[in-house]
């Protein structure tokens, strides 16, 4: 009698895992109040990483570099020197 040696191979190859496939949530950074806009004290003016915009008159800087109004007033963005910006709040 004939003896046959049958071997079956996988019809689908095993698929390895990928190192991609995830993404972080956006941090919603940027200016939150426009130039000339009226704000109340405590309003967030700019959310940023590092000091892209510097605090000016009546503006505070939080621990995560967020700029906020210290008083009620009107927002004013100003240029300081060639490559620096600051934001101030002046009483209305």
Curated annotation (Swiss-Prot):
Q: Which GO terms describe its biological process?
A: translation
Q: Key word Ribonucleoprotein present in the record?
A: yes
Q: What SUPFAM superfamilies has UniProt attached to this entry? A: Ribosomal L27 protein-like (SSF110324)
Query: Which InterPro entries does this one have?
Result: Ribosomal_bL27, Ribosomal_bL27_CS
Concerning Pfam families, the annotation shows:
Ribosomal_L27
Q: Does the keyword Ribosomal protein apply?
A: yes
Alphabetically list the UniProt keywords.
Ribonucleoprotein, Ribosomal protein
Propeptide segment residues: 1-9
Question: Region Disordered: start and end of each range?
Answer: 13-34
UniProt GO molecular function:
structural constituent of ribosome
Gene Ontology CC terms, in alphabetical order:
cytosolic large ribosomal subunit
The entry's comment on post-translational modification says: The N-terminus is cleaved by ribosomal processing cysteine protease Prp.
Q: Member of which family? A: Belongs to the bacterial ribosomal protein bL27 family.
Q: What is this protein called?
A: Large ribosomal subunit protein bL27
Q: What is the lineage of its organism?
A: Bacteria, Bacillati, Bacillota, Bacilli, Bacillales
